[in-house]
Amino acid sequence: MVKTVVESKTKTAVLGFDHPFCVIGERINPTGRKKLAAELEAGDFSTVERDALAQVAAGADILDINAGVVYNSNPNPNETEPPLMKKMIELVQGLTDVPLCIDSSVPEALETGLETAEGRPLLNSVTGEEERLEFVLPLVAKYNVPVVAISNDDTGISEDPDVRFAVAKK
């Protein structure tokens, strides 16, 4: 059977049909969380700390890290997200020993996350958009990481399952 292995420095999570259910904690994400976004812009990572510890205590096998916040002081995520991703990953790795899932729509933040993460993280939210694939697939090969793929391309998410399958095969 096919299986996917995700690792931290000390722990391994195996995803596959003949393995137990794997829980991915998704709370470390400022998208739609105005209070967390404001805290991160102010340099306050206390909610990230609490969310990381609470999710592991609740049984998370993997923690998703998303630094997707647009700062009021600098609205360019290409500049703000990579260093924020690095800080968040370093913080979470210092608090927990579970593997990580790197989640971003900013290519530079993905690369920073992959460089910073210890072990073999999971790469989340990989779409079939041509421009994105051109950047992401070399990173996947360079860091030998598994991905969570989303079956949408430059035209969006199709309602036709055959089109979705074609996008997934990319």
Language-model region placement:
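Domain-level signal for soluble alpha/beta catalytic cores
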Residues: 1-170
